Amino acid sequence: MSDTGHDRIIHDHVITEPELLEEALAETADGAAARDIAEVPAVEIINTVAVHLLSAAAVKCGLADDPEQQTDLDEARKLINAMAGLVTASAADLGDHHARALRDGLRSVQLAFREASPFPDAPGEGAGEKWTGAVN
């Protein structure tokens, strides 16, 4: 990897030049035209990131097809913490409709985390609870 600060991994390839990165991003999604990030509303970006965090956290909590191989509670805690911080910080900007759905999903993975944990955290100390308060 170069130390330009512009390195990115796309489809398992390290892209080191900004121009090549732009080309690679434009060619993703089976040749479909990449959407100009400047055209995407912030609420849509926040929702997309939150859904990715939520999905990854669910898998790491053992809620996917192969829980024996995919469960990783340390990783789940990190993802849930990130989602809790994002949702809490952006709730006012998202509006009630979007924020409520994200909070419901967040609560679900927080409860799944508690259930999967062999050593339950104290109330208020669980994954993401620093930002959401105790979940039960």
Q: Each PLM stretch: what is its role?
A:
Residues 2-136:
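A charge-rich, low-complexity, intrinsically flexible signal that marks solvent-exposed coils, linkers
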